[in-house]
A protein has these predicted regions:
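Beta-rich catalytic cores
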Residues: 48
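Catalytic cores of nucleic-acid endonucleases
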Residues: 68-117, 124-125, 138
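A hydrophobic membrane-anchoring alpha-helix module
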Residues: 174-181
Length: 181
């Protein structure tokens, strides 16, 4: 199930990677396929999942989803399903109650900023803007969570991050890659 973060970031539609990182992660899509075979479900519903799972040296765990395309309402709806299904799959393999999972499981959505300049950025339909996000974060001294995904913070994830590719690299990837050396 282990692969590189680069491989999990591949966008089939546009035939491109969202990161070049060789950091080793669990391919959560492959884990989902294994889970689906195990439960031998007779329903027509296919499970969906986030792209990667990374377990940090400090016991923090990160579910990572890459979105290279435009994030519209249908995409947001699918992100919600991916989170619910991913938690179910995670609980199947890591038998823990939700309270224990919430104490160290985090979620990161990495999106393509260029393709999402004019989209609603929050569930209050404020248009997405990098400068507004930075201003809001510095004034509030906390994370600005876009696309309505703040719903999951403290519900099934400890923290939720919505970051463009550059923010993701600076905020997490550089630190993780140093720890892996």
């Amino acid at each position: 199930m282990k692969t590189t973060l680069k491989e999990t970031s591949f966008d089939d539609h546009n035939q491109e990677y969202m990161t070049q990182s060789t950091l080793k992660v669990i391919n959560f899509d492959k884990l989902k396929e294994e889970f689906f075979k195990k439960i031998n479900n007779d329903t027509n519903r296919m499970f969906c999942s986030n792209d990667a799972l990374f377990i940090c040296n400090d016991d923090e765990i990160y579910m990572i989803e890459f979105k290279n395309g435009k994030i519209d309402q249908n995409t947001i709806y699918n992100l919600f399903w991916k989170n619910f299904d991913s938690i179910l799959i995670y609980m199947h393999y890591k038998v823990q109650d939700i309270e224990r999972i919430k104490s160290n499981l985090n979620y990161i959505l990495v999106y393509n900023e260029e393709k999402n300049k004019d989209l609603p950025g929050t569930n209050q339909s404020i248009s997405q803007s990098n400068s507004r996000n930075q201003l809001g974060q510095s004034l509030a001294k906390k994370e600005f969570i876009q696309f309505g995904l703040g719903y999951f913070k403290d519900y099934i994830f400890k923290n939720v991050y919505t970051l463009n590719k550059s923010q993701f690299e600076h905020r997490f990837l550089k630190k993780w890659e140093l720890q892996e050396m």
